[in-house]
Amino acid sequence: RPTHDQKKIREIEMSDSAISATAAAEVDVALIGAGIMSATLGAFLRTLEPQWSQIVFERLDAPAEESSSPWNNAGTGHSALCELNYTPEVRGRVKISKAVAVNEKFQVSRQFWSYQVNQNVLPDPREWINPVPHVSFGRGEEQVSYLRKRYEKLANHPLFPNMQFADGRQKFEEMLPLMAEGRPETDKVAISWTDAGTDINYGALTKQFLAAA
């Protein structure tokens, strides 16, 4: 017998050829969870195999209500512009190979999204992608030195355009006023940033993908 939770699972049709599981013996693709991962995979498959039927199973009342919700994730275009863990310092030298690899993958995502926009699958890109500066922060001699080295390595790479660096209070207070407020003037701080960053609303992106299915 199905449990209470199983009874709550909802079916979302994703293509003209998809029909509910109660009326069909099988479908070509069953996607579990109506979040960004299922929506993206479904969009890929509709492009590559448009004759395949698809169905999404979701336990909640609407798609993109868990990790894909804009309130439940950072919402950044994940391109290693400000994430310091992708640029470790090893024996005094900053390594950027991982940051480059992550950025390249994000550019592939942007190409796919652009194609979907051009195909009118995603009708309103401003609803889910917008420019926003990505900023890194360092405090103390060691972190400031690291941030400067990181900036120097990334500044000349084409995947990290318009990278900037400042180790004075004025730019810090301008860019990060809430972090600057109440901080002692004696604190040695630095920031690096680029205006090439993006803010992504994965919930809105998910819903546009599913609405077009």
Language-model-detected regions and their locations in the chain:
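Short, flexible, mixed-charge acidic loops at enzyme active sites
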Residues: 70-74, 181-182
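Short beta-strand/turn micro-motifs composed of small residues
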Residues: 33, 58, 138
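Glycine-rich FAD pyrophosphate-binding loop
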Residues: 46-70
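Short, hydrophobic/amphipathic alpha-helical packing segments
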Residues: 38-42, 106-114, 206
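N-terminal Rossmann-like FAD-binding beta1-loop-alpha1 element of flavoenzymes
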Residues: 27-55
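Dinucleotide-binding Rossmann-like beta1-alpha1 core, especially the glycine-rich loop
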Residues: 75-175
